[in-house]
A protein has these predicted regions:
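Terminal disorder- and signal-encoded targeting elements
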Residues: 1-270
Length: 270
């Protein structure tokens, strides 16, 4: 599809089209867009933290542009004659939303499709390391195994996300401090340090706390022979989407004290 634009500058062409003067091929909430209605653009795919655009090598277009949800140009490339693919870095600080991928020449938009870039990170499972020591990372110390949590998360969205916070609140021995400046996620190759891992669309990963939420001690909860029940919340924070998700869990403490306590957790019903 070719739409002539009465403009003298290429950037004006891009922003005008982004504002809605061009009908584009359908937008998908999966990680990629096949583009039967996208003219010379055959496919747009999210590959990790990059956007891969495939197009007709014989296109008349001379450039490629990616327009952000705001209507501003997110990226621009000159096309190499005879090439059929361009890769655009997305990174982990992009504004989430619907982007428009365009093939352009000096005075017109040759083809365009929409692509969703929006992370959606969910908690799939949570385990106390003390109850599953075999699932902790190699080299974890005994106190770390006693105190930390393993969280399985999945990105069911269409864009990558950098995890910047893993917080715990509620009826646990050591809630996450409000003034914590680090992520609260352990770097497993250097477990005494924090990390901010990236999770790509479609990926499932385990992350490990490093704030000792279930360390023995503290006066927030007590462990009793008859059992003490409570509830706590797990919060994930991302660089792109902000607060991504929170999940509540029921917890029971049974034993003489927190240094000799059986702790069981179960996902709370919504």
């Amino acid at each position: 599809m070719t739409h002539s634009i009465p403009s003298t500058t290429r950037r004006t062409v891009l922003t005008t089209i982004a504002a809605g003067s061009l009908a584009v091929a359908g937008c998908t909430d999966s990680g990629s867009t096949d583009s039967p209605g996208g003219g010379d653009i055959s496919r747009v795919d999210v590959d990790g933290i990059e956007l891969v655009v495939e197009y007709d090598a014989e296109t008349s277009a001379t450039g490629l542009a990616v327009i952000a949800p705001s209507g501003e140009a997110f990226a621009e490339r000159q096309l190499t004659p005879g090439a059929s693919q361009e890769t655009i870095p997305i990174g982990t600080a992009y504004p989430p939303g619907t982007y428009t991928v365009q093939l352009v020449d000096e005075q017109s938009v040759v083809a365009a499709v929409e692509q969703s870039l929006r992370p959606d990170v969910v908690i799939r499972d949570l385990k106390l390391a003390r109850n599953h020591p075999e699932e902790m990372y190699e080299g974890a110390a005994d106190f770390t195994i006693t105190s930390e949590v393993i969280v399985t998360i999945e990105n069911i969205g269409t864009g990558p996300e950098e995890l910047t916070g893993l917080h715990f609140d509620g009826d646990i021995p050591r809630p996450t401090p409000d003034d914590l400046e680090e992520s609260g996620i352990a770097a497993v190759n250097q477990p005494v340090t924090y990390t901010e891992p990236v999770i790509n669309p479609g990926d499932t990963i385990n992350v490990y706390s490093i704030t000792f939420p279930f360390a023995p001690g503290g006066d927030v909860v007590s462990c009793t022979p008859e059992g003490t029940d409570g509830r706590f919340t797990v919060i994930l924070i991302g660089n792109v989407a902000g607060e991504l998700t929170e999940r509540e869990y029921n917890v029971t403490y049974q034993g003489q004290d927190l240094t000799d306590c059986q702790i069981s957790v179960k996902r709370a019903e919504s």
